[in-house]
Amino acid sequence: MGKCRGLRTARKLRSHRRDHKWHDKQYKKAHLGTALKANPFGGASHAKGIVLEKVGVEAKQPNSAIRKCVRVQLIKNGKKITAFVPNDGCLNFIEENDEVLVAGFGRKGHAVGDIPGVRFKVVKVANVSLLALYKGKKERPRS
């Protein structure tokens, strides 16, 4: 049996389309609101947080490395997340209890590459860009 094709079937076609929209993954994610609730950022692109500890996350097979990450507690809602620290030696610019700005890490809420369970990356430390610190253009403010 196919779809209704006759005159006066607009209501049926419309209700059928409305019901079947919910089988589409993207539509369901956008309209249920549960994905937004589960997102630590609460729909925002960036969030500030306090560094709790530095952690090393082991890369997934077949790679063998310890990826440098930090545990961050977000200021806006108190949720704890793990954020990747990009570039070589940038973990040295970050200390515990620092305020960091964290952003998403690529794949729309999924982990990236060989780093399991890490969905965020550090962008700024103490209101100074991590990239500027890495390139030597700026220095960390003395506190």
From Swiss-Prot:
Q: Which residues carry this modification: 3-hydroxyproline?
A: P62
What processing steps or modifications follow its translation? Answer: Hydroxylation at Pro-62 affects translation termination efficiency.
The answer, when asked if Metal-binding is one of the entry's keywords, is no
* Residues covered by region (Disordered): 1-26
**Molecular function terms in GO for this entry?**
structural constituent of ribosome
Q: Which residues carry this modification: N6-acetyllysine?
A: K135
Ranges of biased composition (kind: Basic residues): 1-20
Q: Which GO terms describe its cellular component?
A: cytoplasmic side of rough endoplasmic reticulum membrane; cytosolic small ribosomal subunit; nucleolus; ribosome; small-subunit processome
> Any idea what this protein is called?
Small ribosomal subunit protein uS12
The gene it comes from is RPS23
